[in-house]
């Protein structure tokens, strides 16, 4: 164990030392996560926003099914890898080195997509982009587990919401402006012979800068306990009992699965708009600006709402945003209302991401945190991989409106499950802690009375 545990013999003393280390290093760890998120997420948003990649694949192929295949392959890469990552990191005292490796490999794929656009063409370019999207997802899965685990180790739960709120605010300002600039000038002007490649190169530079600064700033604590290393087969067998013993987490997983199933529609928002008002770099940039601006405007509200009421509230409101914005998208055709619809979709995505990435930590013990997060992310990646492919088939046969209504139904089911069956885990934990404290108090009172009786008898 670390020096902070020297001479400490009881579990309570080690827990107090661990908490002390976290608060002592909170300022620099807060800054590290803030800068990493601001720069890193700014670059990743250029890749993950439902505009640039779908539009690029459509330009290269002219096919809705290929757009679906790209989204499917990216998510498919993250289906199994999170669980393997969790099994590797949950028994380690420190995971920063492996996190840096995973983060670097994830960023390399963005650079590869950029270089392929300059050096290749035709079918070879299309296949290469699809391949690197798969690798991007493959490393994205374990990277997400590792960095969320680091966040949980370094930042107290009472500060995570506002950290991510301010981080998303800053990153949203940069990303929104950058997306408009990239769409209008880099893609629209075909800078360096391929505006999309230039955009992805810019994303690589930003994300790499964030990762480098993060590694120089943060101080990772060693937890007072770590889970004993378990073979993968045995660890997988424990997943079902984990769900059975924690029904709140189980119902949350079902609700999250339905919410993610609604991603059948996500790659087709920009394609649908392009078919209605035409494709151009300015249209792509403007709607990406709307989607990402929602992070800027809403992130602080999401963060403080989560710190005050818990992350379940974010999830519920995000689903309402998604449902309303999808209905609006189908009903309007003017640029202003389309901008508002994409803003609503981005606001919902912002709230959902903040909730889904953090609420998982609150459902059980710290030692199982990595596996809960990995299981949750794996389920999300699986549905995200299947969803767009199914959406592509539906779009090609029944049209875009049918895809959008399927998404709305899935989101409505998730909303009902959250409202009826999933209790805010923070509230449940505080209630259990209060009951435990009351039981200890009653035990202490009983012991004191017994000692007094014994003294009287003597």
Predicted feature residues:
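Helix-to-loop junctions at the C-terminal end of transmembrane segments
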Residues: 81-94, 186, 297-310, 395
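Intracellular juxtamembrane helix-capping segments at the cytosolic ends
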Residues: 140-155, 351-365
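Helix-loop junctions at membrane interfaces in 12-TM secondary transporters
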Residues: 30, 115-132, 330-342
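Helix-loop junctions on the cytosolic side of multi-pass membrane transporters
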Residues: 211-228, 419-432
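Juxtamembrane intracellular "pre-TM" segments in multi-pass secondary transporters
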Residues: 3, 8-27, 220-254, 433-458
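Transmembrane alpha-helix termini and helix-breaking/packing motifs in multi-pass membrane transporters
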Residues: 54-59, 87-91, 114-121, 175-198, ...
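Structural signature of the two symmetry-related core transmembrane helices
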Residues: 97-113, 204, 313-328, 405-408
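Helix-loop boundary and gating motifs at the non-cytosolic
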Residues: 2-80, 85, 89, 96-106, ...
């Amino acid at each position: 164990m670390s020096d902070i545990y020297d001479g400490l013999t009881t579990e309570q003393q080690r827990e107090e030392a661990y908490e002390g280390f976290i608060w002592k290093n909170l300022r620099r760890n807060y800054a590290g996560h803030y800068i990493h998120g601001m720069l890193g997420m700014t670059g990743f948003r250029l890749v993950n926003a439902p505009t640039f990649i779908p539009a690029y694949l459509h330009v290269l192929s002219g096919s809705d099914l290929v757009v679906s295949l790209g989204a499917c392959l990216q998510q498919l890469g993250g289906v199994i890898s999170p669980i393997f990552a969790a099994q590797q990191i949950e028994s380690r005292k420190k995971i920063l080195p492996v996190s840096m490796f995973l983060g670097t490999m994830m960023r390399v794929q963005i650079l590869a997509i950029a270089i392929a656009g300059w050096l290749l063409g035709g079918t070879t370019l299309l296949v290469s982009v699809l391949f690197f999207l798969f690798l991007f997802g493959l490393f994205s899965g374990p990277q997400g587990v590792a960095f969320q685990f680091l966040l949980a180790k370094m930042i107290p739960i009472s500060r995570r919401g506002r950290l991510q709120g301010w981080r998303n605010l800053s990153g949203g300002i940069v990303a929104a402006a950058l997306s408009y600039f990239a769409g209008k000038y880099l893609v629209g002007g075909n800078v360096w012979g391929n505006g999309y490649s230039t955009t992805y190169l810019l994303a690589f530079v930003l994300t790499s800068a964030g990762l480098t600064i993060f590694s120089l700033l943060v101080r990772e604590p060693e937890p007072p306990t770590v889970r004993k290393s378990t073979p993968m087969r045995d660890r997988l067998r424990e997943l079902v009992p984990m769900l059975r013993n924690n029904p709140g987490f189980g119902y949350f997983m079902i609700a999250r699965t339905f919410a993610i199933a609604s991603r059948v529609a996500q790659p087709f928002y920009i394609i649908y708009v392009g078919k209605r008002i035409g494709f151009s770099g300015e249209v792509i940039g403007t709607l990406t600006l709307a989607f990402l601006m929602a992070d800027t405007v809403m992130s602080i509200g999401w963060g403080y709402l989560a710190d005050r009421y818990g992350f379940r509230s974010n999830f519920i409101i995000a689903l309402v945003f998604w449902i309303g914005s999808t209905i609006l998208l189908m009903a309007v055709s003017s640029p202003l209302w389309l901008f508002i619809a994409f803003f609503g979709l981005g606001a919902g995505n912002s709230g959902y991401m903040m909730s889904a990435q953090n609420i998982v930590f609150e459902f059980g013990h710290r030692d199982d945190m990595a596996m809960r997060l990995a299981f949750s992310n794996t389920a999300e990646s699986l549905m995200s991989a299947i969803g767009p492919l199914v959406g592509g088939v539906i779009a090609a046969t029944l049209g875009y409106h049918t895809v959008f209504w399927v998404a709305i139904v899935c989101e409505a089911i998730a909303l009902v499950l959250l409202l009826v069956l999933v209790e805010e885990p923070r509230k449940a934990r505080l209630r259990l802690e209060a009951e435990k404290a009351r039981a200890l108090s009653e035990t202490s009172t009983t012991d004191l009375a017994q000692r007094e009786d014994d003294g009287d008898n003597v």
